[in-house]
Amino acid sequence: MPPKKNPLGLNALQLKTLTLFQALAALEDHASPAADEPGAVVVTDLPRPHGDHFHLGRGVVASRDATGLANPAVWTALARKGLIRTTGPVGTVVVTAAGLAYQTGMGDLLHQADH
């Protein structure tokens, strides 16, 4: 039997936010390995939108798809499911190995851009 889609029952905003955390975790400018948790990544320096979008590496994300980055309830829900941990200063998150591996099905949030 194929794996269940969204086995933790995340809502759309939680899925979008986790997708963005996963993308940030892949960028050297925003992430580093977590010293205390094998397979986890510390994400810092969350991007700030300008206008209706923000840049994520070579990609662009619509601001409307990133509201969860500033929503404490979303962070709490993702932490409760074991996908992230909040730590240190505001705007710092540890994406757990489970969070990095979770299939959100929302990779289309990231659009390639030339500017």
Task: Set out the residue ranges of the language-model regions.
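Generic N-terminal initiation segments characterized by hydrophobic and/or small/turn-forming residues
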Residues: 43, 53, 75, 97, ...
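Short, amphipathic alpha-helical interaction segments positioned at domain boundaries
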Residues: 3, 80, 98-115
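Minor-groove-contacting beta-hairpin "wing" of winged helix-turn-helix DNA-binding domains
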Residues: 91-96
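Short, amphipathic alpha-helical interface elements at domain boundaries
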Residues: 2-67
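A short, conserved structural fragment
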Residues: 79-89
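Short amphipathic alpha-helical interaction segments
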Residues: 63-81
